[in-house]
């Protein structure tokens, strides 16, 4: 794009003269080009004007870049040709300071990026923009770095104000409650306390309602007083000079009642109980006393002892032992009967043994005698016929 009043060839020649050898022509300092375009004086010595404008514009470019960006290289005063100026774009790898800021406050990170983007607008090609636009763009970075740090502080102040507002509101509620400006809950509590004070629940007609604002010690004292009134109401003091009578059945403590004997009797009759009662008392009925239970326990161990206690007219155990009875005997009588039985058994056993031996001997004797007789008969019967045959004149 050629500017009016300037030939395209002159601009290219000036760029080739200003740029150092070995560098591409697209990396010529843009601030010098902007000032060269803004100068409306046509002269033939283009190089001298370009160098003078670059020297005057170098401090302005350094001030617009700010103290944070150190990437721009300031040309030395001894050199005529400027060094390479890199564009002020945000780096792809953020520094540790930027990472920590982004972790702590994302809003501050975005504002820093916006400020860097606005500062990088200066490096756009100057030959495509007019004089007024470039001057406006150059003036914007001068105000942006100043306003950028103030934005996080304002945001932090607003955040602190929002965080402090609930605390202040709670403190206001507490202060209002202390000054008497209660909330709806305090009003409802006061209203319910007033209703309870209007409709008390007393244990007896003479009791009075306790105020709601009394301490626990005062409430305990009132309860003790009310109990004393109760005791006076139920048990009036006796007249002077008279002995206080014992309390009747109706003048008993609350929660107690006299014993009922019907609770300790059998609720239903049992066949076993009826049979045992009929054996002992000669009649049918249920349990009536503890003696029946004791008698039953003895009858279960031995019916004879229980019958002896009930049927005999003796009053002591010694009488029962010395009395004549089939089952009740003294210890000596029992020992004598045992000894007599033993002796009688021994004697009878011995006599029976002797009788048995005698019987055995008798049988042996009888058999022996019979054997001798049979032998004599045999001899006599055999010897006599032979002698008769030997002596025929024996007759």
Swiss-Prot record:
Primary localisation category = cytoplasm
Pfam families recorded: DUF4678
Q: Residue spans with biased composition (Polar residues)?
A: 53-65
Q: Where in the cell is it found?
A: Cytoplasm
Report the GO terms under cellular component: cytoplasm
The UniProt entry, under InterPro entries, shows:
DUF4678
What is the name of this protein? Answer: Testis-expressed protein 44
**Taxonomic source organism:** Homo sapiens (Human)
Name of the gene: TEX44
